[in-house]
Swiss-Prot record:
InterPro entries given in the database record: Trm112-like
This protein's name: UPF0434 protein SPO3421
Entry-linked HAMAP family: UPF0434 (MF_01187)
Top-level taxon of the source organism: Bacteria
Family annotation (Gene3D superfamilies): 2.20.25.10
Family that this chain belongs to: Belongs to the UPF0434 family.
Any one cellular-component term (Gene Ontology): cytosol
Organism annotation: Ruegeria pomeroyi (strain ATCC 700808 / DSM 15171 / DSS-3) (Silicibacter pomeroyi)
Length: 62
């Protein structure tokens, strides 16, 4: 039996902010990332848990 990945709880967006800019984040469901447009970074969501470490973030294209 295969397990489906844990879903991200969108209510977390009310409490989470970008660790760089302290601005709100946008949820990209397709990529499973939280996006900070100000910092131009996308933070991964793994097993339903956002990884809010700058070293783990993906730089966004301009």
């Amino acid at each position: 039996m295969s397990e489906t990945p844990a879903a991200f709880d969108r209510r977390m967006l009310e409490a989470l902010v970008c660790p760089v800019t302290h601005a709100t984040l946008e949820y990209d469901a397709g990529a499973q990332e939280l996006v900070s447009k100000g910092a131009k970074l996308a933070f991964p969501i793994r097993n339903g848990i956002p990884v809010m470490l700058v070293d783990e973030a993906r730089p966004l294209d301009d």
